Regions:
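Non-catalytic accessory segments adjacent to catalytic cores
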Residues: 57-193, 419-434
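A short glycine-rich, hydrophobically flanked beta-strand micro-motif that places a catalytic Asp/Glu
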Residues: 81-83, 215-218, 286, 361-369
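Cytosolic ligand/metal-binding cores
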Residues: 48-53, 115-140, 235-309, 386-435
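An N-terminal JmjN-like helical accessory module and its immediate linker preceding a catalytic domain
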Residues: 1-53
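Conserved hydrophobic core element of enzyme catalytic domains
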Residues: 314-435
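A residue-level signal for conserved active-site and pocket-lining positions in enzyme catalytic cores
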Residues: 81, 113, 180, 234, ...
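An anion-binding catalytic pocket shared by soluble metabolic enzymes
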Residues: 26, 30-42, 102, 107-111, ...
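Short amphipathic
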Residues: 1-5, 190, 301
Length: 435
């Protein structure tokens, strides 16, 4: 393989006939799961189903998922999945979603491609699929730029939307915090994007100018999404080592290094941003303490500044080792949703979000994840993302509110976060009229 993994993966995503795939970038690996030979889902009412089997009772939806995965009849499987934000309502006793879409879906792919620099691992359940995969990978590795030309940049006004209404909701949430209803909440808003958006080209353009912890591109029938996750909800390896990566506290980045350094120093000294970060790390420690051996728990990074595209954040990492009797799904149930996309305490923040946002979030602030047969899990927080459902395309971003917040600053923060994605949107050039 001579093509970089990310570019090769996007070429493959753009050319496969499959209407169901997930591309997941982690470190130097891009992996793609194509179609599904088996699925495990959590329904809106909390029922766990596996497409090929009847499951017994379980103590919780996540325990039911662990039970379902334990019976998968394939060796060395990898599941590709996603969880909507509203799964959190179910896990925290607020009821699930009123819709019909599953709150969590895990798919064992019919075929899989794992790309690293200079190599490709191809896996399939059928030898014919394997031959087809090999031919596709070889062809796309040798391909040049499409004759249709470069995608065209398109604009989105990140200040669009009902500014007054958003600030009104922020003010209402601040009043609730001043009355000690909760300590922190993230309120988000959406911005519409052009319907002729090219999802794959936009993903590649955005990724080239971004430095995410993870990135993803997925399609499930008429639903598509891509994103540049600034942090992970949870990372667990096969040995039971677990970590979570709260990012909270945000400042803009620009093209001037001296100005960026000034903004960095300002971020590290801003009482509001520090307070927002500190309470997030505190909750992450409390949650991790409930699933980890006490002597293993620690903060391996604290208030580092991480650059993510056109914004920078305060970042910390809380790490430990799963206690006896705990597994990846115990950790997921405890840590989902990310504190940095919900609030503190989580249950009260979830209720606030449901009251102050006009519609369910869906995948926004949920996660896209990989789960391996050896017990490993990697779940990317879905932020800095673009969504398409049918003919509608949109972006969504939120701001973290603490008692010292102001509606004006939180509106500006959503604009900054939206801009980090909006400036890289692309569509294919229109056909030449002479043709």
């Amino acid at each position: 393989m001579t093509t970089p993994p990310l570019e090769l993966a996007t070429r493959l995503a753009a050319t496969v006939e499959s209407q169901h795939y997930t591309l997941y970038e982690r470190g130097d690996e891009c992996s793609i799961g194509l179609d599904a030979v088996m699925q495990v889902v959590i329904e809106p009412d909390g029922t766990v189903r596996r497409s090929d089997a009847t499951l017994g009772p379980a103590s919780s939806p996540c325990a039911g998922v662990a039970q379902a995965l334990a019976g998968i009849p394939f060796e060395g499987w990898r599941a590709y999945g996603r969880a909507d934000f509203e799964l959190a309502h179910l896990l925290h006793g607020l009821g699930g979603s009123q819709g019909s879409r599953p709150l969590l879906t895990l798919s064992i792919p019919r075929a899989e491609i794992r790309l690293r620099p200079g190599q490709a691992l191809l896996r399939a359940l059928d030898s014919t699929d394997l031959d087809d995969l090999q031919a596709r990978v070889v062809a796309q590795d040798a391909a040049s730029e499409p004759a249709a030309g470069q995608p065209v940049q398109i604009g989105v006004d990140t200040h669009a939307g009902e500014e007054h209404l958003y600030k009104q909701h922020v003010a209402a949430a601040l009043a609730e915090m001043h009355a000690h209803a909760y300590q922190k909440v993230i309120l988000s808003r959406t911005v519409e994007a052009p319907a002729d958006l090219d999802m794959v080209a936009s993903y590649l353009a955005g990724r080239r100018c971004n430095t995410p912890a993870r990135s993803f591109l997925l399609r499930d029938g008429d639903f598509q999404a891509y994103g540049f996750s600034p942090e992970t909800v949870v990372e667990i390896d096969a040995l039971g080592r677990v970590s979570t990566q709260p990012l909270a506290g945000t400042s803009a980045l620009c093209g001037d290094s001296a100005e960026n350094e000034r903004l960095r120093r300002e971020l590290l000294a801003d009482p509001k941003e520090i307070a927002e970060h500190a309470v997030s790390v505190k909750l992450a420690l409390q949650e991790m303490a409930s699933i980890c051996s006490p002597d293993s728990l620690g903060v391996s990074e604290f208030m580092e500044v991480s650059c993510r595209g056109s914004v920078q954040h305060l970042a910390s990492r809380v790490s430990g080792r799963l206690a006896s009797g705990r597994d990846a799904w115990s950790a997921f149930e405890t840590l989902f949703p990310a504190v940095t996309a919900s609030g503190i305490p989580k249950r009260e923040a979830l209720d606030s979000i449901r009251r102050h946002e006009p519609a369910p979030r869906g995948l926004y602030s949920g996660c896209v994840l990989l789960v391996d047969s050896d017990g490993a899990m990697d779940a990317a927080l879905v932020l800095r993302a673009v969504y398409r459902h049918g003919e509608r395309c949109w972006l969504q971003a939120g701001a973290g509110l603490v008692p010292s917040s102001t509606p004006e600053r939180e509106w500006t923060e959503t604009c900054e976060k939206l801009a980090s994605v909006a400036c890289h949107l692309r569509r294919r050039p229109l056909p030449d009229a002479a043709d």
